[in-house]
């Protein structure tokens, strides 16, 4: 009996030790996974390629919350690296979790936003618009001008593609105002260019000229060379097609200089 008791006791000890080891290593793995997800998230804005590299080295494992976070970060990283995913299975996985967590409003909105972008790339414009308008409703309860600006830009793009230029202009203007509030001058310049394009297609040449000029001033001030060139090219084209005005001398010089640099 004593031998039997000793055997049972040693078995229990071994099982307990094995369980403790499993728990220890699982805990270490989870902490490592969370740490790597934190690292990827911190890099997403300015170094999206590095963020994507980290995420590609990880697996969608851990708790439901970790798996959802991984799916959202991966979707965001693909988008920021201009990898045009048209399959929504990954972002759907994130939504399956976040839709039950209304207190995590920021991630709910981001999930719906990136899901909308996937739908848009897949050609489902009505589906994308439905998701974007759902995000717009949710964002009313937050103070996230940068993300609101991104959202309004996307909604504007949908309406612009549908040739509804007045609605497109409305949302591009909302985007510009939010980017201005967020102090993101690059995105503000892009949104101003979008407003100008919508205005041009609405046949309001004078207003389009003012907006392209405003975009050019912003791009010059902050040395956004590509945006300055886009503003300049469109402004020159407007002067030509309007037939109303002679191109100002300083603008003509800039156009000639830009043409020579090409």
For every predicted segment, state its role.
Residues 13-15, 209:
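Glycine-biased, low-complexity coil/linker segments
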Residues 1, 20-21, 168, 175:
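N-terminal leader/targeting signatures
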Residues 1-12:
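N-terminal secretory signal peptides that target proteins for export/translocation
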Residues 15-24:
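Sec-dependent N-terminal signal peptides
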Residues 7-8, 27-262:
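A "functional boundary" signal
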């Amino acid at each position: 009996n004593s031998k039997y008791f000793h055997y049972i006791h040693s078995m229990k000890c071994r099982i307990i030790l094995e369980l403790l080891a499993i728990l220890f290593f699982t805990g270490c793995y989870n902490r490592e996974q969370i740490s790597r997800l934190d690292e990827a998230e911190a890099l997403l804005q300015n170094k999206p390629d590095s963020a994507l590299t980290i995420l590609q080295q990880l697996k969608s494992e851990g708790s439901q919350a970790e798996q959802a976070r991984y799916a959202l970060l991966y979707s965001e990283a693909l988008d920021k690296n201009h990898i045009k995913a048209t399959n929504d299975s990954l972002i759907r996985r994130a939504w399956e979790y976040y839709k039950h967590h209304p207190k995590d409003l920021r991630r709910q909105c981001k999930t719906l936003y990136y899901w909308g972008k996937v739908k848009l790339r897949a050609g489902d414009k009505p589906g994308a618009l439905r998701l974007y308008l759902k995000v717009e409703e949710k964002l009313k309860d937050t103070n996230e001008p940068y993300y609101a600006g991104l959202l309004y830009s996307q909604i504007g793009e949908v309406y612009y593609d549908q040739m509804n230029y007045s609605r497109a202009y409305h949302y591009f203007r909302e985007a510009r105002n939010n980017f201005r509030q967020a102090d993101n001058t690059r995105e503000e310049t892009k949104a101003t260019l979008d407003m100008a394009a919508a205005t041009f297609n609405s046949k309001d040449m004078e207003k389009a000229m003012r907006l392209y000029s405003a975009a050019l001033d912003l791009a010059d001030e902050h040395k956004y060379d590509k945006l300055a060139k886009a503003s300049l090219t469109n402004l020159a084209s407007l002067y030509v097609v309007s037939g109303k005005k002679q191109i100002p001398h300083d603008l003509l010089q800039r156009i000639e200089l830009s043409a020579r640099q090409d």
